[in-house]
Amino acid sequence: MLKIGRKTPLTNSDSGDNLYQVNGVAYIEGNLKLIHLRILIVLISHLQAALRFKISRRRPGIKVPESMLPDPGVLSLRGATRTVRVKITEFGLTPRNCGRLRQYLEELIDMPVVFPGYRKEGMIFPELVHSFTGLITDYDFPVYSRTVDISLPETLVHRLLLTEEGFSTYSRSAAFSITNKYTVRIYWLICSWRSKGGFVISLSNFRKILALGRGYDRYENITCKILRPAAEDLEGRFPIWFLYKTYGSGEERNIVFKIRTAVSPEQMKKESQYVWDVCFHLLHSVGANTTILSDIFSKVDYEDLRPFLSKVMDLTTYIKEARLDARHLTDPGHDKHISNVNAYIRAALNAWFSDWRIRYQDISE
């Protein structure tokens, strides 16, 4: 396997091996080692045709053509299966150093994993399973073979193809270059939330997803052994990295991730201009002084352009609705809290900038 040193940057040229992955994989609960995660990455790489098909059709519950799915396998005690044939070189191994692969596959047979439940109004998937007694059901790996046949529960294949819950892309070579299992999990998370600029997660949920043992009971251990090393490993070497802050204490503590991405100056200028123009017209539509935008926009990072635009849209929509409601009420104080639109917008945006918990979505809910 190609080894990439800590100081070797992974630029955008490394993105040609991007893999699609449903967002639920980033939240998978299980005591998965680094090699287990790499095996999962390889298995997902064999589902790319099916994932691309579902993503391109954009219809809930669409059936994937049989030709795009792994071959049907034997009926096991756990039900129907699908078999994926994998070259051992895909794991970064050669026939001479793959002896322990059998051990890792054996571990995955009895490795319980749980995906997040999926619920969305008007969309029912009665056949969907979220909890599995093993990530795989069986494997066939003859001595000296250059390939291994891995059997997956058919219900697991369906779960890995649940694009209705959202999906993301990440670089396979980048994920394989990471040498810490927790950093891989964080890499998946920030890739799935990059369009939102960041996310908030409770400490208890973070522990649960990463299956942290008693050695991480103290938050200081999580900071020193997981968050800080992951941030340092990704920053400057990957085209996507993160900053983080914590709020609260004890089990009420929240970790807030701010996601950073490498973009060209041209792309930054183009998207900044678009967001500026839309925000300018939105503020003008509610009678706000557009100089507010000049004062605040200089503080907006590229990753926060979309969240900033969303915030301005929410503010102006709320102001319009409040004014409309006030016309039908006799209470003169009903609209008092936004009687000064400029002060209201400025205060709301300043609070949005100062508190990352307001800026980003809480994924623990």
Task: Report each predicted region and the residues it spans.
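Charged, alpha-helix-forming regions
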Residues: 1-295, 299-312, 316-365
